[in-house]
A protein has these predicted regions:
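Residue-level detector of Asp-centered blade-edge/turn motifs that repeat once per structural unit
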Residues: 24-25, 65-66, 108-109, 191-192, ...
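WD40 beta-propeller blade core
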Residues: 39, 80, 129, 206, ...
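A short helix->beta-strand "capping" segment at the edge of beta-propeller domains
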Residues: 1-14, 45, 167-172, 362-363
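Hydrophobic beta-strand positions that form the internal "hydrophobic ladder"
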Residues: 29, 70, 113, 196, ...
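Conserved strand-to-loop turn within each blade of WD40 beta-propeller repeats
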Residues: 32-35, 73-76, 116-124, 199-202, ...
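WD40/WD-repeat beta-propeller blade N-cap
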Residues: 10-17, 52-58, 94-101, 176-184, ...
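Short loop/turn segments that connect beta-strands within beta-propeller blades
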Residues: 43-46, 84-87, 133-136, 210-213, ...
Length: 407
């Protein structure tokens, strides 16, 4: 069950990584950083494909499901729109006021862009703005710019090109936070774009009916700010991670709590979480042979895995028992660490900088590994490939199969 690689290290940023995203086809990883850059990585070949330049720290990015457009938001409230194939900057949108953009997401049909933002210094002016993507990407005439020489790395980039900003298009729909002493942190579409899932600063998760403009559900799952969440529609689950050091697994339909994890003690910030669906290489298919035909000897629904003789060695037999003959394994992956302002005097093992992988439903810890020298700020996953970005400015690419099956 050996994997091709354990971990790849992608070096190209000078400041902390803020967010990572895979392209829908899994070909590229996009990394947004406080160094004002987004890098498009051809990670399979360990190369930079393109560098996109902002004029401030890039905090959030999202990729259209068609893999045609990238949207990136920075600390000055600017949203840049990029054509991924040509790497052309289509538009730079500047809000009228100085907004802090905390999340960018796109609907599964690529029709709506959902932006979570708050006005700097204003507790009450916090809202979610939903735009029509066709209004966002609409091209406008540009002034001609002289071609500049390539940067020293000889990587194509937008570094030296000046981009004229434009006012934001008309908001299609706006959701304002009704509670005065909290803020929206993140939002995304769910349920075939009929609903919007929202996380709040006070530990609440909310579901908003996008079609009928009403709140469906509001419930408190954490004792502090929810820093991240992820949704898996096929299995009907949400996972959320928080400043309170806990990760919750929640039923998407009933909003009942399924599991609660507290990975570290003392409490560390859980900055990012992702759901992973991994094929089980130890799954025994009815009618196939691993030494003998199993379907004639066992009812697979009540298979006694302690009596297995189909695997070559004891290690494989133990793995087969561990994963209980499930065709797929559903994972909850979480990472974070000690607050970055305290990190300079912290030992790597004491900071809670590990990536931890759990079985969503059983709650069993399946793997734990340490690969960053500081807090992990963001996770992204595509199939069995997990990417992590840290305060140490590095992007790591991990083969999950190695940590689950090769150890």
């Amino acid at each position: 069950m050996s994997s091709v690689y354990k971990t790849k290290n992608l070096q190209g940023h000078e400041r902390p990584i803020k967010q990572l995203k895979f392209s829908s086809n899994g070909k590229y990883i996009f990394s947004a950083s406080a160094d004002r850059k987004v890098i498009k990585w051809d990670y399979k070949n360990n190369t930079k494909d393109f560098i996109y330049q902002h004029q401030a720290s890039v905090n959030v990015i999202c990729i259209s499901n068609s893999d045609r457009y990238m949207f990136s938001g920075d600390s000055t409230g600017c949203i840049y729109v990029w054509d991924i194939d040509s790497n052309e900057n289509i538009k730079k949108i500047q809000f009228e006021k100085l907004y802090n953009i905390t999340s960018l997401n796109i609907s599964s049909d690529d029709i709506y862009l959902i932006v979570t933002c708050s006005e700097r210094g204003q507790k009450s002016n916090n809202f979610i703005a939903i735009y029509l993507v066709e209004d966002i990407i609409k091209k406008t005439p540009k002034e001609e710019t002289k071609e500049k020489p390539a940067n020293l790395l000889q990587i194509p980039s937008m570094m030296n090109q000046s981009i004229k900003s434009e006012p934001a298009p008309e908001i299609y729909k706006k959701i304002e936070c009704s509670e005065r002493n909290t803020k929206f942190i993140k939002s995304c579409f769910t349920n075939m774009n009929k609903s919007i899932l929202i996380s709040r600063q006070d530990g609440f998760l909310e579901m908003y009916d996008f079609t009928n403009d009403k709140l469906i559900f509001s419930g408190k799952f954490h004792n502090d700010e929810i820093l991240d969440f992820d949704v898996n529609y096929e299995n009907g689950i949400i996972i959320s991670s928080s400043k309170d050091g806990e990760m919750c697994v929640i039923n998407l339909n009933s909003f009942q709590l399924i599991n609660r994890f507290k990975p570290t003690n003392p409490v560390r910030l859980l900055n990012s979480c992702r759901i992973g669906i991994i094929d089980n290489p130890y799954y025994l298919i009815p009618g196939t042979k691993r030494g003998i035909s199993i379907d004639t000897l066992f009812d697979l629904n009540t298979l006694d895995l302690n009596k297995l003789v189909f695997f070559e060695n004891e290690k494989d037999r133990e793995k087969a028992k561990k994963f209980k003959n499930k065709r797929q394994i559903i994972l909850a992956i979480v990472a974070g660490g000690q607050d970055s302002k305290f990190v300079t005097t912290t030992e790597q093992k004491e900071g809670g900088f590990e990536i931890i992988i759990y079985n969503v439903f059983s709650g069993e810890k399946l793997a734990e590994f340490l690969d960053h020298f500081g807090p992990i700020n963001t996770l992204a996953i595509h199939d069995n490939v997990l990417a992590s970005g840290g305060e140490d400015s590095s992007v790591k690419v991990h083969d999950i199969n190695h940590y689950l099956f090769d150890k």
